[in-house]
């Protein structure tokens, strides 16, 4: 039955729950003297069996999906989640983000692309790589 269900209803429902949860922690102390929201950005690769998940090829005999997460450190609530195939490079996620003015983005060097980081700067946000 799940194969025929549209996955977008679950994505929309998840976003509604995330929005409610972030409101609950909006006033929580972060432990840092920063006025803006602090986000951590990273991804994880989930290995899958290629014979069971042929739609997610990663290597010759392996399948994988990547979960890219933008985590609001106040409350440790995901603010943005994107699923991709395992081959999709992390830096591409910066093209999907809508930068928040005054926010701080902490990310590893997989997101190091000067044009994309400059777009964060132009939006009035800050980043640490």
Predicted regions located by residue number:
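Conserved, well-structured functional cores that handle cations and Mg-NTP chemistry
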Residues: 1-129
């Amino acid at each position: 039955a799940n194969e025929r269900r549209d996955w977008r209803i679950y994505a929309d429902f998840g976003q509604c729950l995330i929005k409610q949860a972030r409101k609950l922690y909006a006033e929580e102390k972060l432990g840092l003297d920063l006025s803006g929201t602090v986000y951590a950005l990273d991804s994880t690769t989930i290995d899958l069996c290629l014979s069971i998940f042929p739609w997610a090829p990663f290597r010759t005999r392996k399948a994988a999906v990547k979960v890219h997460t933008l985590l609001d450190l106040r409350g440790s609530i995901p603010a943005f989640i994107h699923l991709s195939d395992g081959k999709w490079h992390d830096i591409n996620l910066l093209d999907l983000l809508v930068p928040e003015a005054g926010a701080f983005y902490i990310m590893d060097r997989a997101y190091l692309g000067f044009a994309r980081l400059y777009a964060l700067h132009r939006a009035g946000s800050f980043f640490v790589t």
